[in-house]
Amino acid sequence: MKIYKKSILVCSCTLAIFTLAACGTNQNQTMEKQDKTTIQQDKTDKVNYTGTYSNLNSKESVEDVRKALAAHLDKDSVDTFFNLVNDYNATVGSVGLTGDFSTFTKTEYDVEKITNLWTPKKGDFVGTNCRINSYCLLKNSIEIPNVEKDDSLLFLDNDAIDKGKVFGAEDKDAFDILFSRVKTEATTDVKVHAAKMEQFLSQFKFNENARMLSVVVHDDLDGQSLFIGHVGILVPSEDGYLFVEKLTFEEPYQAIKFATKEDCYKYLDTKYENYTGEGLAKPFIMDNDKWVQS
């Protein structure tokens, strides 16, 4: 098992020290509202999911994904997101990024080559990660309460936001609240941690159609806490569901088409299941404010 320290945890969905960091519904239909009880994931065939993916490195894939996102999110947010996508791909897109959707298998990216293309053009702005991009998409369609924040694990995110002038002070404050560290107990029991995360996220009003799927990790370096180490947005599409994510600061955007939302849960669950350590609970998935049991 991989034992992560604070620097590794914070970099989930960031500087490649830690790779965590990071059907059948019509596009015009709304995604069914989740029950108020915990979401159950089918325990059979856990790793059996299929999909197609794109790094949004073609006009056709961008138009396809834009259409799916625009059906459930405001134009300004979608435009802001694609400005970030286009800037990233224009800078590093020559490093084998896919355009048209193709069969989704395990993806690996040459971070060294990407960095060598990015840094000379962008300097000390490291780019954006999963949390920044997810917030850009959701910020106008969710309600974030004015509650106390703990942004101690967001210093890399906030530095990138400032240096890249991604958004202003008000949005930055809301971002820090949404992705705050959450206090928890010293236990490996995921149920305990999931209840803490559900309680915290219940304060927010989420978009029922553009859903925030989060991978929550447990950390014990500076007290017992929970942190959204990876996050992306799931929307209904013409062929099922579309999941949009930015893997890390260096690694690219991925738009993945799944037949069912359960397939997306399985993708996240299996991709990040080993990011834990001795005495720590395994990562778990949240769909908006509900725990997805695996």
What is the meaning of each model-derived region?
Residues 1-11:
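Bacterial N-terminal signal peptides that target proteins for export
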Residues 14-15:
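Repetitive helical segments and hydrophobic/amphipathic motifs
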Residues 18-22:
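C-terminal motif of bacterial Sec signal peptides marking the signal peptidase cleavage site
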Residues 23-294:
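Cysteine-nucleophile amide-bond enzymes
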